[in-house]
Regions:
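Canonical Rossmann dinucleotide-binding motif of NAD(H)/NADP(H)-dependent dehydrogenases/reductases
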Residues: 2-34
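Active-site loop of short-chain dehydrogenase/reductase
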Residues: 6-7, 56, 83-84, 131-145, ...
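The beta1-alpha1 cofactor-binding region of Rossmann-like NAD(H)/NADP(H)-dependent oxidoreductases
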Residues: 40-41, 61-72, 106, 143
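Conserved amphipathic alpha-helix within the SDR
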Residues: 47, 51, 57-61, 67-82, ...
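Substrate-binding pocket helix/loop in short-chain dehydrogenase/reductase
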Residues: 98-101, 105-110
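Catalytic loop of short-chain dehydrogenase/reductase
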Residues: 141-165, 170-171, 175-179, 192-195, ...
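SDR active-site lid
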Residues: 179-261
């Protein structure tokens, strides 16, 4: 679909990182933007910044894991602007799980699934029927990750499982939209191709009490800066992709009607080929054994 001034874009996880970058890009193209995030102070700051730049903004505190709150977000967006043309289900969290899978706390899985999987489904259910009924061109972008969306990083297995689910959900959504002959498209986003400076590393700051850790962590949470410093001390330079480049990539992908919003990357291509070859040859997933798991 063609992005045009006056259209409306809804972005979850919009207070920072990729979500805020997408909102800024849409606003720069003249779209009205609806920002949703669970973090109120950061959301207010993001909305104020966009308004200062001349954007038309509606901001709402939303926990995407709560179906009722996402339905209320849709009601508010349609009441305020009368239409929604672009939906970016972008909110996501890292689970904070430690150790082997059988050592994980159930709450790590429950929280990650509530936001990363149920949050995407809630967005689809709240907005897509109205977008189809409107009959205007529209597009849905669901944020996945190379971790899980392509192949799992075993040291972050909970996150990987949720992001694999997002890929399959979006493939199914694409097929359902085609079956309805809808003018609404769908894409799955793999942010990158390199590391990104986002708040995902500090997801625990927004962890709700209902999914509190049952026991103290064996190691303290590390910020992105701490991890980057540790990598440098180990002699490994980390390359980063600016979130603004991701936002540009999304806007270009929507305009081109691309399903796979997967930036070119030799590393990603190797993973895809290795996993596909393993399946086609009915071979064990040896490509996972190269990861350090301790």
């Amino acid at each position: 679909m063609r992005l045009e001034a006056g259209q409306v874009a809804v972005v979850t996880g919009a207070a920072s990182g990729i979500g805020l970058a997408m909102a800024r890009r849409f606003a720069a193209d003249g779209l009205k933007v609806v920002l949703a995030d669970v973090e109120e102070s950061a959301l207010e700051k993001a909305a104020a910044g966009l308004r200062e730049d001349g954007a038309t903004v509606h901001a709402r505190v939303v926990d995407v894991g709560d179906r009722g709150q996402v339905l209320a977000l849709a009601d508010a967006a349609y009441e305020r602007f009368g239409a929604v043309h672009v939906l970016c289900n972008n909110a996501g969290v890292g689970s904070g799980a430690e150790g082997r899978m059988w050592e994980h706390e159930p709450n790590d899985w429950k929280w990650a699934f509530e936001v990363n999987v149920w949050g995407v489904f809630h967005g689809i259910q709240a907005f897509v029927p109205r977008m189809i009924e409107a009959g205007a061109p529209g597009h849905v972008v669901n944020t996945s990750s190379g971790d899980g969306g392509i192949a799992p990083l075993p040291t972050a297995s909970v996150y990987a499982v949720t992001k694999a689910a997002v890929v399959t959900m979006t493939e199914s959504l694409y097929a359902h939209l085609k079956a309805e002959h809808a003018r609404v498209g769908a894409s799955v986003l793999f942010p990158g191709p390199h590391m990104l400076r986002t708040g995902l590393w500090e997801s625990h700051r927004n962890r709700p009490e209902r999914y509190a850790k049952e026991r103290p962590r064996r190691t303290p949470y590390r910020s992105l800066g701490q991890w980057e410093s540790a990598m440098k001390e180990a002699g490994q330079e980390v390359e980063f992709t600016p979130v603004e480049e991701v936002a540009d990539f999304v806007a270009e992908g929507i305009a081109a009607g691309r399903f796979w919003l997967l930036p070119e990357s030799e590393h990603s291509d190797r993973q895809i080929k290795a996993r596909s070859a393993s399946m086609l040859e009915r071979a064990n997933p040896a490509y996972l054994e190269s990861f350090i798991l301790d």
